């Protein structure tokens, strides 16, 4: 088995294309004997070249084929027509130059004029949890069940690939894993789309492709910020719609919902992530941490979300701070300002938006999303808001996926949506017209993908050229 693993690794590395800085081409060599991908914290591919700061946002700084194949649950490679990773120039929260990576998945029989930007639920303050790494065969999960959510999301992503769409997956938290820094996430998402469209010379993606946005939970907020920032930051992009599931408009409200729950660790990762973006928060955090609890708290910065959730499950996170809930870290006006800066909305989208939300959402109360929709609608945004009576936050990510796929399919097919706002309270999103059919097909496709079926529609949706390996 080890020999087979090394043989597969060697073949992938042999066919790995040169890595370019734009003009001069640098050959990127990895050791053939490695049996797992190098994590981002150690991989030189993730380090931008000198002078990158002078390039425009969305510029491709470097490109490669992933060292290891994209795989279901880190163990079962899926058969794609091609996969690329691009390091590209972006902007941080404060508009300063930064660089991050997006992974571009091209299905068999792809329609290169349709692109989906999928924002995963990373929810971690550790760079080695980034999807560009986590989705590769034999990646380290960053603790027990660390990247299990990202692994599971590949099952949803394949539903998009089976429609023939090119899927780009940005590492929207950036090189420091600034979880909850959603301005950065929005910029990284938009610049990831720019980079994907600019990759046409080596990927074959149509530079004028129509683009959809999709994300659930934390990924939905990154997608929403991209929609908010799109009109001013990247108005040239032909984004045709955004599907948001389980959106979390207010971090402050979510803190109280998460505390003492199974996912209380999200609070810990969020605090560490924000302190990486807003560096002046670091000494503030240190001043509030209870000394004998500090090491455990900060250990979350070296683990991925599933492992952090296990470490802090059912704990009172406010007790980690001097002053507790009443006068601790989150009562500090400097920290409250940071949380408010990353609340929604932060702009007025010009694209139609589908919002799916559980009435019984245990992480972010439905009232927050009701208020968000009201703000959007009062500013003329076209919204289709569906309130699901039966689901909870996590379940909606699965049961709402078929509705998101159907809605995005119409947008990418050029079917216009009626302007204005529409709110409906439904029994279950999965019972919407066509949803069960999509769910059934997705389950069957994923089972067949595990058996080696080429990922993509059976009939070619457009004659395209995918550069050979």
Curated annotation (Swiss-Prot):
Give the active-site positions. 217, 361, 393
Coiled-coil ranges from the UniProt annotation? none
Record's family? Belongs to the AB hydrolase superfamily. Lipase family. Class Lip subfamily.
Q: Which Pfam families match?
A: LIP (PF03583)
Annotated region described as Disordered, given as residue ranges? 40-59
Q: Where is the composition biased (Pro residues)?
A: 40-51
Question: Where does it sit, as one GO cellular component term?
Answer: extracellular region
Name of the featured protein: Lipase A
Q: What is its EC number?
A: 3.1.1.3
Assembly and interaction partners = Monomer.
* List of glycosylated residues: 111
Name the catalysed reactions: a triacylglycerol + H2O = a diacylglycerol + a fatty acid + H(+)
Q: Where is the signal peptide?
A: 1-22
Query: One MF term from GO for this chain?
Result: triacylglycerol lipase activity
Q: Where in the cell is it found?
A: Secreted
Cysteine pairs forming cystine bridges in this chain are 129-304, 377-421
Alphabetically sorted, this entry's keywords are: Disulfide bond, Glycoprotein, Hydrolase, Lipid degradation, Lipid metabolism, Secreted, Signal, Virulence
Function as written in the Swiss-Prot or TrEMBL entry: Hydrolyzes triglycerides, with a preference for substrates with short-chain lengths (C4 to C8).
Major subcellular location class: secreted
The organism's place on the tree of life at top rank: Eukaryota
Q: Source taxonomy lineage?
A: Eukaryota, Fungi, Dikarya, Ascomycota, Pezizomycotina
By its UniProt entry, which InterPro entries does this protein fall under?
A: AB_hydrolase_fold, Lipase_secreted
Q: Does the keyword Protein transport apply?
A: no
């Amino acid at each position: 088995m080890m020999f087979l693993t090394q043989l597969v690794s060697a073949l992938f590395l042999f066919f790995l294309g040169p890595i370019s800085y734009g003009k001069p081409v640098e050959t990127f060599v990895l050791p053939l004997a490695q049996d797992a991908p190098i994590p981002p914290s150690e991989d030189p591919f993730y380090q931008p070249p000198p002078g990158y700061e002078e390039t425009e946002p969305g510029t491709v700084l470097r490109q490669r084929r992933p060292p290891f194949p994209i795989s279901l649950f880190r163990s079962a490679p899926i058969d794609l027509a091609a996969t690329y990773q691009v390091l590209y120039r972006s902007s941080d929260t404060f508009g300063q130059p930064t660089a991050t990576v997006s992974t571009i998945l091209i299905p068999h029989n792809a329609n290169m004029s349709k692109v989906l930007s999928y924002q995963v639920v990373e929810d971690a303050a550790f760079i080695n949890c980034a999807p560009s790494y986590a989705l590769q065969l034999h990646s380290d999960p960053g603790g027990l069940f660390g990247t299990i959510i990202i692994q599971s999301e590949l099952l949803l992503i394949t539903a998009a690939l089976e429609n023939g769409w090119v899927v780009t997956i940005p590492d929207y938290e950036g090189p420091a894993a600034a979880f909850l820094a959603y301005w950065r996430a929005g910029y990284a998402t938009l610049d990831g789309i720019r980079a994907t469209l600019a990759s046409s010379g080596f990927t074959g993606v149509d530079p004028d492709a129509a683009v959809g946005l999709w994300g659930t939970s934390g990924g939905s907020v990154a997608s929403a910020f991209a929609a908010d920032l799109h009109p001013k930051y990247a108005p040239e992009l032909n984004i045709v719609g955004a599907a948001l599931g389980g959106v979390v408009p207010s971090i402050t409200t979510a803190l109280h919902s998460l505390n003492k729950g199974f996912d209380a660790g999200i609070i810990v990762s969020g605090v560490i992530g924000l302190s990486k973006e807003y560096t002046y928060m670091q000494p503030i955090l240190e001043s509030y941490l209870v000394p004998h609890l500090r090491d455990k708290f900060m250990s979350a910065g070296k683990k991925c979300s599933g492992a952090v959730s296990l470490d802090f499950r059912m704990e009172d996170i406010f007790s980690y701070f001097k002053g507790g809930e009443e006068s601790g870290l989150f009562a500090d006006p400097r920290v409250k300002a940071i949380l408010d800066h990353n609340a929604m909305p932060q702009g007025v989208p010009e694209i139609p938006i589908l919002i799916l939300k559980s009435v019984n959402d245990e992480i972010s109360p439905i009232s927050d999303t009701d208020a968000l929709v009201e703000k959007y609608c009062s500013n003329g945004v076209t919204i289709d808001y569906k309130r699901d009576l039966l689901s909870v936050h996590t379940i909606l990510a699965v049961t709402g996926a078929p509705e998101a796929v159907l809605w995005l399919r119409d947008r990418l097919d050029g079917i216009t949506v009626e302007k204005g706002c529409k709110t409906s309270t439904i029994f279950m999103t999965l019972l919407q017209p066509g949803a069960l059919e999509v769910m059934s097909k997705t389950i069957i496709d994923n089972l067949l993908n595990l058996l080696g079926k080429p990922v993509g529609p059976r009939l070619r949706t457009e004659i395209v050229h995918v550069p050979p390996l």
